[in-house]
């Protein structure tokens, strides 16, 4: 009887240790492997410091995020450091070309914005040289085609041009069924956005539900609506 009790105690200890090791391993791997979703990922805590920086440089209540006028950023990739600047009109600085007439405007995501190159290395900069015009770059990283179109609608009123270029890559299209980027790009917890959807064969707009800075602290109150309109929630979470 004594041996049986000892065996049961030993087996219980082993099972507890295995469970603790599994929990520890899952939490470690979860930080690097975005496809491993655990309970804390359902309602992640938003960094106060990160939000403060996001509000000053990138938050937009309608579009979700934007490159704000008169902001700049440096980014390192390997041994290369690149810099970008946004001018007072809200598009990427086009240096000496800004004095030229504007006939072309560009909208889209980071491929349009030309991330990881300097202001004098963007394809809009070279297109400006080829056309002898000021090609305005309104691209924003992580945008879906929906956000690019809404940005076009906003900017075209005061930045009319003869030609508009919409930059599209596969992810630009995938993002149109996303409402919270965290569900599509794990960890992108500040990225709440609008999206279009079809209702009775008509195109309708689901507006950005986190449309004020104060709503970030209580974003969980809107999770049901967000999840209902986010295609990737059901696929990943």
Feature map (PLM): residue ranges:
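N-terminal Sec-pathway targeting helices
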Residues: 1-14
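A structural signal for well-ordered alpha-helical scaffolds and beta->alpha junctions
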Residues: 14, 18, 120-124, 145, ...
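Membrane-interface motif at the C-terminal end of an N-terminal transmembrane signal
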Residues: 14-33
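Interaction-surface signature
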Residues: 27-61, 146-237
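Membrane/wall-proximal cationic-aromatic binding patches
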Residues: 29-130, 227-230, 236-237
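Conserved beta-strand elements of the Class I
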Residues: 103-107, 136, 164-166
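A conserved hydrophobic secondary-structure block that centers on an alpha-helix together
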Residues: 128-149, 154-157
